[in-house]
Amino acid sequence: MELVQQLIADYGYLAIFLMLVLGIVGLPIPDEVMMTVVGYFTHTDVLNYELSILISFVGALLGMLISYMIGRKAGRPFIDKYGKWVGLKEKRMMKVEKWMKKYGPYSLILGYFIPGVRHVTCYFSGIGKMDLKTYVAFAAIGAFLWCFVFITIGRVIGIIHV
């Protein structure tokens, strides 16, 4: 938590952007905590509220797009080769692909709010070759809502705390 605060204090919007891109791709970065801190900093006028939402949105969406592309280009061969080590055998992959075809776009929106799920929905969307325009549209809706909610929570905490 202190490291997140220090990075934001030292590098501002660049730190927010990079932490979200890398966190969405899969590095262990506490995204929700980070955005709540960002929201708090918007209350204390260290950061601008609207710009923080915009930068967070762009970082989250870029991270989702990178993950989608990795899933689309390398996902299926990687799963075929190494999936058995993490419980993703052919039968389970077929279930996942069927589920993603049916609920995939909506899982992108809901998945943002479930830690761990947002990280895999993007890869599985790419593996399942979801249409890129559909993917970007639903990922963008989810990214905006997710960033807005957590940054606003942090801002409200700042207002209540004072």
UniProtKB/Swiss-Prot annotation:
It is a multi-pass membrane protein. The keyword Lipid biosynthesis does not apply. InterPro entries: DedA_domain (IPR051311), VTT_dom (IPR032816). Its main location: membrane. GO terms for cellular component: plasma membrane. The keyword Transferase does not apply. It is found in: Cell membrane. It comes from the Bacteria. The chain crosses the membrane at residues 7-27, 51-71, 134-154. Keywords: Cell membrane, Membrane, Transmembrane, Transmembrane helix. Belongs to the DedA family. PANTHER family: ALKALINE PHOSPHATASE LIKE PROTEIN. This is Uncharacterized membrane protein YbfM. It comes from Bacillus subtilis (strain 168). The gene is ybfM.
